Amino acid sequence: MRHLTLSIEREVVRAIEGVDLVETRRCYRDQNEFVVLDRFLTQPVVDPFLREVGVLTPDVNRNYVPGHKKGGSVSFYAIMSQAPAILSLYRSPALLTFLSRLVDAPLMLCPEDDPHSCALYCYTQPGDHIGFHYDTSYYKGK
């Protein structure tokens, strides 16, 4: 696992080096705090994440909240036990620093004992969606 973590971290650092932070931050602000970084990570880096999504598929919990969302999710506990690559990306110090700089605010990981600290959301069926919303933190800060 340590080798996987170091490998993913190295690739995240490499990807960040290719991003124009000033321009990306401008786009982020101009687009109501939303930005897409096409091909941020190379396909060989993404492939382990996709394999893990396949492993996690049986753990998808589907739900529907009228007017808000319809889709599925996989819990943090399943990710911790079955998806080391996804977890390494979530915990990447380089990614956290980059995102903090992008949004111009300090970001932190949620505590390990919070079952909602990291989840995989799956919008795979016709009609799946998520409405506009703002997630607030239950911890100190925003």
Q: Which residue ranges define each predicted feature?
A:
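Non-heme Fe(II)/2-oxoglutarate
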Residues: 2-8, 12-101
